[in-house]
Swiss-Prot record:
EC number(s) recorded for this UniProt protein: 3.1.15.-
Name of a matching Pfam family: RNase_T
Main location class: cytoplasm
Cell compartments where the protein resides: Cytoplasm
Gene this chain is encoded by: orn
Job of this protein: 3'-to-5' exoribonuclease specific for small oligoribonucleotides.
GO MF annotation, one: 3'-5'-RNA exonuclease activity
Keyword rRNA processing included in the entry's annotation: no
Positions of the catalytic residues: Y128
Protein name, per record: Oligoribonuclease
Annotated organism of origin: Hahella chejuensis (strain KCTC 2396)
Length: 182
């Protein structure tokens, strides 16, 4: 299969949901074939943010990222947003042609908003389309609730694990909802 057909999966963890006031604190990428077979797992990066940014997190983010250890990793990281973006772009250039892959993941529109604000070159590396697994989740919940009930997610809110779950979830929907097999 051509690298032009490979899919880029991305997940960001942020200090909140508003790209005007919140920041990216973790990111990971995975590349799969169009048949959802793993090509490569990219870097998982805790993006340094100053204490002044971390102090603005709401209780949910403070508790979630604190319990996972992410807040500590962010404080100890020496990788800023520009370096994180460069590392991800360097990795992606090895596996996917620029402008070819949709942005893949769960509720990926939110990730795209943060990339457009803080990592413009990375956002531009993607095709303008999104492959959002949450669309199938919402359709299954409404049209085939028994299919939707078959998904059990950990919801770890750790970028790489969330991507792995998203790929698995799409495989599940392909088989049980779309009824497509390899």
């Amino acid at each position: 299969m051509s690298r032009r057909d490979n899919l880029i999966w991305i997940d960001l963890e942020m200090t909140g949901l508003d790209p005007d006031s919140d920041r990216i604190i973790e990111m990971a990428v995975v590349v799969t074939t169009s048949n959802l077979e793993l090509v490569a797992e990219g870097p998982v990066i805790a993006v340094h943010q100053p204490d002044s940014v971390l102090a603005l997190m709401d209780d949910w983010n403070r508790n979630t990222h604190g319990a996972s250890g992410l807040t500590g990793r962010v404080k100890g990281s020496t990788i800023g947003e520009a370096d994180a973006e460069k590392q991800i772009l360097d990795f992606l250039a090895q596996h996917v042609d620029a402008g070819c892959s949709p942005m893949c993941g769960n509720s990926i529109g939110q990730d795209r908003r943060f990339l457009a604000r803080y990592m413009k070159d990375l956002e531009k590396f993607f095709h303008y389309r999104n492959l959002d697994v949450s669309t199938l989740k919402e359709l299954a919940r409404r049209w085939r609730p028994e299919v939707a009930a078959g998904i059990k997610k950990k919801g770890s809110h750790q970028a790489l694990e969330d991507i792995r779950e998203s790929v698995e979830e799409l495989r599940y929907y392909r088989e049980h909802f779309l009824r497509l097999t390899d």
